[in-house]
């Protein structure tokens, strides 16, 4: 593959840039950090795009040494380099209230993301699992019922993989055309505003920057990355990522522990 004239490099974090080290949390390799910093140094804008909260992504960005725009909450929020809000979509309060009630009645662990704060009940083992993966600050509540009536940026149910699949099949017809339901990890079912999509957020950002698809390279490993790698002129999938994503990708590279993305950047973007 010839060297790509990339003006905007967009990448997912977990499983794409970050290695999940279980008890030790997630990290990026020095080689990949160096490659991302070299991209910015040559004038390529580096945008981090994740399902995580904006504040959590900025912490990771500082560790990586990059400071471009941020797509957070799986595309529900877009902020520019100076953290100015460019777009923010929220979930209908009625839908959010129904999901909160369902989770409380069934004893399901639910994350409620609202106004930059993550609220959750301390239900094990899901509390420790989520904190171990993301290190996000959480405000614990005895019940999420008081949150009914608010418009969260997104909701995340974490439970057994089989239950995640069953819930998706149960709730998708109910909220068709009104909310997006997406499995972002085997144990995660996210309920998001219908407008929330990394691809839509990337298209919005590209328009604001007067960039065309061929100016953009995007990388990811999950179903929530399909939109953005499909929009980008060059879409990169991680080898151990979701099959549906790999089918849409132009290039497949090794996982972060094998330095696949770092090697691609070194050989094709620098």
Where are the regions that the model predicts?
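Short, structured coil segments at secondary-structure junctions
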Residues: 64-66, 73-74, 175-177, 231-232, ...
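Asp-based phosphoryl-transfer active-site loop
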Residues: 5-22
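Asp-based, Mg2+/Mn2+-dependent phosphohydrolase catalytic module
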Residues: 231, 236-270
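Short active-site oxyanion
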Residues: 43-47, 67-68, 154, 214-216, ...
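Short, acidic loop-to-helix structural element flanking the phosphoryl-transfer center
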Residues: 25-44, 88-96, 137-140, 195-207, ...
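Residue-level signal for inorganic ion chemistry
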Residues: 14, 39, 74, 155, ...
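Active-site phosphate-binding/coordination module
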Residues: 29-127
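Conserved acidic, metal-coordinating active-site core of Asp-based
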Residues: 102, 106-109, 113-219, 223-231, ...
């Amino acid at each position: 593959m010839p060297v790509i004239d990339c003006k905007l490099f967009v990448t997912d974090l977990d499983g794409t840039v970050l290695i999940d080290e279980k008890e030790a949390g997630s990290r990026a390799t020095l080689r990949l950090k160096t490659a991302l910093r070299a991209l910015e140094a040559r004038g390529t804008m580096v945008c981090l795009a994740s399902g995580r909260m904006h504040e959590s992504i900025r912490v990771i960005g500082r560790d990586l040494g990059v400071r471009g725009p941020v797509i957070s909450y799986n595309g529900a929020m877009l902020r520019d380099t100076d953290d100015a809000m460019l777009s923010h979509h929220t979930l209908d309060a009625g839908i959010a209230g129904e999901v909160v009630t369902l989770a409380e009645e069934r004893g399901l662990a639910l994350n409620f993301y609202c106004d930059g704060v993550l609220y959750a009940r301390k239900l094990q083992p899901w509390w420790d699992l989520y904190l171990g993966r993301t290190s996000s600050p959480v405000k614990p509540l005895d019940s999420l019922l008081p949150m009914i009536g608010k418009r969260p940026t997104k909701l995340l149910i974490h439970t057994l993989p089989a239950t995640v699949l069953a819930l998706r099949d149960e709730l998708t017809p109910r909220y068709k055309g009104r909310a997006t339901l997406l499995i972002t990890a085997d144990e995660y079912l996210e309920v998001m505003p219908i407008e929330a999509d990394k691809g839509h957020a990337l298209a919005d950002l590209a328009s604001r920057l007067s960039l065309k698809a061929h100016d953009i390279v995007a990388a990811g490993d999950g179903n929530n990355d399909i939109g953005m790698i499909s929009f980008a002129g060059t879409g990169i999938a991680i080898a151990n990522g979701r099959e549906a994503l790999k089918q849409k990708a132009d290039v497949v590279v090794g996982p972060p522990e094998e330095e696949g993305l770092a090697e691609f950047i070194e050989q094709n973007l620098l």
